[in-house]
Design a protein with these regions (language model features):
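C-terminal-of-GTPase-core extension/linker across diverse P-loop GTPases
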Residues: 121-201, 205, 209
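Short, small-residue-biased leader/transition segments that mark boundaries at the very start
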Residues: 1-6, 206-208
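Conserved beta-strand/loop subsegment of P-loop NTPase cores
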Residues: 74-79, 102-104, 114, 118, ...
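Short beta-strand-centered segment that lines the nucleotide-binding/catalytic pocket of NTP-utilizing
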Residues: 7-16
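Short glycine-rich anion-binding loops that position phosphate/pyrophosphate groups of nucleotides
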Residues: 81-82, 186
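Conserved ASCE/P-loop NTPase catalytic core
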Residues: 19-27, 42-59, 68, 104-108, ...
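Switch II of P-loop NTPase G domains
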Residues: 26-74, 82-97, 101, 159-168
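Short, conserved catalytic or interaction motifs in soluble domains
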Residues: 14, 21, 81
Length: 209
């Protein structure tokens, strides 16, 4: 079993689990082609402890946790939507929108540090290299976007070069996000439809791109 802790930023390593993706077509194809072995697709989950305000500056184990997810393809943000006086919340109340904004801000701060390092490196060659100069302009555009409180994933990329560059930066705010509402067991039957916290979560979860 995995180690559990109800406190944010507990001193534990991430839990990593690999789950196979069910697909009925695999058996049919395996039988049709008389395959000796059928290997299903898998998804690797990296479960980190909760982040808190200041995580990007090292509060709790924030920097370590952020580093653990920088290489992932997508982020699943589990958001607390249940009331229980016996389960503490680091901010003292249940507010999923506030929690999401807190995490997003920490991801933005972390990405800005990545961009600053890249900008410093590219600046050294930008005067003599046209491609480097173009990338520098793009980096400044991303930086301004993030400093405006927006996620990188909401940016409109204009060229193939921009798409290629963005793919190399591993920005946390460029990754697709799934918000998973953590509800009480008695709310599972109606998918939390009567829970105002879930409804507010649905409201802000419009696709970004």
């Amino acid at each position: 079993g995995s180690e559990m802790c109800i406190r944010d930023s507990c001193t534990i390593d991430p839990n990593v689990g690999v789950v196979t993706v069910p697909d009925e077509r695999l058996k049919l194809l395996g039988d049709f082609y008389h395959s000796k072995k059928v290997t299903p697709a898998v998804i690797e989950f990296v479960d980190i402890a909760g982040l808190v305000k200041g995580a990007s500056k090292g509060e709790g184990l924030g920097n370590q946790f952020l580093a653990n997810i920088r290489e992932v393809d997508a982020i699943v943000h589990v958001v607390r939507c249940f009331e229980d006086p016996n389960v503490i919340h680091v901010d003292g109340s249940i507010d999923p929108i506030r929690d999401i904004e807190t995490i997003n801000l920490e991801l933005v701060f972390s990405d800005l540090e990545i961009l600053e390092r890249r900008i410093a490196k590219v600046t050294k060659t930008a005067r003599m290299d046209k491609e480097a100069a173009k990338e520098l302009d793009f980096l400044q555009k991303i930086k301004a976007h993030l400093e405006d409180g927006k996620l990188a994933i909401t940016m409109e990329l204009e060229t193939e070069d921009e798409e290629a560059w963005m793919g190399t930066y591993n920005l946390l705010t460029w990754k697709p996000v799934i918000y998973a509402a953590n509800v009480a067991e008695d709310e599972l039957a109606d998918d939390g439809a009567s829970n105002p916290h879930v409804l507010s979560l649905i409201h802000i979860s419009e696709p970004t791109r």
